């Protein structure tokens, strides 16, 4: 049977297309029907810039077609003709998906702070316990989101060679027994290993987002340093708040936590600003509008305020507990809000972009359109 020629080896949509607008065949065979068509035609692949190498070729003219009217794609916003093709908000990942990134990132950050405490001779037990609880809560959010929750815990382990979700799950499987053993045995060495696993867990979460090629707000390379910095900042923020409330438990770890919050807040605001700069011109208008709307609060409340409060805690020890608590909570809550907004509110998909408008009559090939972008 020859694909594209024999109806029994050809998709029904191609067989049923009375306009002969759809063609199917083996593009790897130079003698196939589609290979011959492609050789004599001008074609493009939709969203080829994503690097996914789709096997759909769009023919917009033959090799002799004029492109006198062709040029760069025209980006349009708020055009009535855009309906149905411009980017729309994805509906597959909701607050439960955001909860996974919140719980996992915060838990990984807490595990890193526990490793730091162990390395400095402090007692990391409370931080390890909180880290395990936070990561477990995040994974439970994923469990709530799965369509077949009884099959998902097993099926997620099947593709370590390609899936960052699989790698996230595998690191989680190792993280829990190591962190529990460190807590049970009081082992500083295992606490440090658990911290490294927590950092790796946050890294996989960042890679999950960057590999979601259909969502411009996620796939940008600047997403990874943002996810890493905010996860660490969230863990440091909660640790700092805990040292203010339970000073006896954390015995002198407050100053280390203050410096960690200061450093990570600076790193995160730099990552946030770089993320927004990288998205400019590389994301739909609605994504940029959502992120731009929360930017002032992210900068002022989420970073300048906690940096100032942490500095005040260092300068005025008498008010250190209150200032440290507020600084830590501000950093953590801002990270949670940031992830929720990126995952749920700013996650507009790519939409559809037509790189070239097919030749009709003598007018030649016109420039393509990219609705919802500017």
Task: Label each region the model flagged.
Residues 346-374:
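Short, highly charged, low-complexity non-transmembrane loops/tails of multi-pass membrane proteins
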Residues 110-171:
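Membrane helical hairpin/interfacial module
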Residues 67-120, 340, 346, 362, ...:
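N-terminal signal-anchor module of multipass membrane proteins
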Residues 154, 158, 246, 288-289, ...:
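Multi-pass alpha-helical membrane architecture of UbiA-family
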Residues 1-92, 102, 133:
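Non-ligating segments of multi-cofactor redox enzymes
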